[in-house]
Amino acid sequence: MAAAPGAGGQGGGGMDAVLLDDIIRRLLEVRTARPGKQVQLSESEIRQLCTVSREIFLSQPNLLELEAPIKICGDIHGQYSDLLRLFEYGGFPPEANYLFLGDYVDRGKQSLETICLLLAYKIKYPENFFLLRGNHECASINRIYGFYDECKRRFNVRLWKVFTDCFNCLPVAALIDDKILCMHGGLSPDLTHLDEIKSLPRPTDVPDTGLLCDLLWSDPGKDVQGWGMNDRGVSYTFGADKVSEFLEKHDLDLICRAHQVVEDGYEFFADRQLVTIFSAPNYCGEFDNAGAMMSVDETLMCSFQILKPAERKGKFMASNKM
């Protein structure tokens, strides 16, 4: 399979382009198989995905500055067959530009396939495919919620540690055309200027408090004014007043975040000044939520593509919703 222009040199920097294409081919082969079919890459292939993508993350800013058109996806949580459906619907890279808002691993059954495909696309299309850090891209969290166990069962703990080194270098926010600010969690009382995001150190673990913690953990709160307690026991909740204040101060139009299951896959807050996007339908098999992806066109108009929750045991359908 011939590599796309630029994939060999630029995209495959530090990784053999033929090998990279073969890894992507194997990961996509299961599209036609039963959902849940595993793809067994070798340990050495996965290590390469981690180390090469890590260098790319570090070479790009911690606050990514991106341009529309772009498609934005929320939490995936190891639901690999749903990730493949998102791409089938939005177009497989490089057909569309993508920004993912974090939480690739844990809870679902196929965290390894999920993160490997995302890292492979990052290496192949470094200027068109972007990944932010979620609160689950952190050793103390994914040690508990499934990723560690999956790595240990299918490979070994050493490989989990290689992923940790990679996750510690993920960028934490993105700004689209200077108007849409994206992160996994939300706002922080410690965020007064966007440059503060740029100067957060990497590699780094996620601390228990402070700006980085809040960007990955905070939530909007319907009955909150200002800053409130967060039921998660980490970070804060913030009211609609804080959203309006922040947008006005920084001349922004919208905050786009993930981090919470929402029934329709997307949900507005603060008079459409903030949107939550969640891309794992039937989350954990326990919710009947839809998944969504937000498309931002050149004029910054946002529309939503919905992955409906499956009929029990059935395939699920897609519908386009404004």
UniProtKB/Swiss-Prot annotation:
It comes from the Eukaryota. Binds 2 manganese ions per subunit. It catalyses: O-phospho-L-seryl-[protein] + H2O = L-seryl-[protein] + phosphate; O-phospho-L-threonyl-[protein] + H2O = L-threonyl-[protein] + phosphate. GO terms for molecular function: metal ion binding; protein serine/threonine phosphatase activity. Its EC number is 3.1.3.16. One of its GO terms (cellular component) is nucleus. The keyword Metal-binding applies. Mn(2+) 1 binds at residues 75, 77, 103. Belongs to the PPP phosphatase family. PP-1 subfamily. This is Serine/threonine-protein phosphatase PP1.
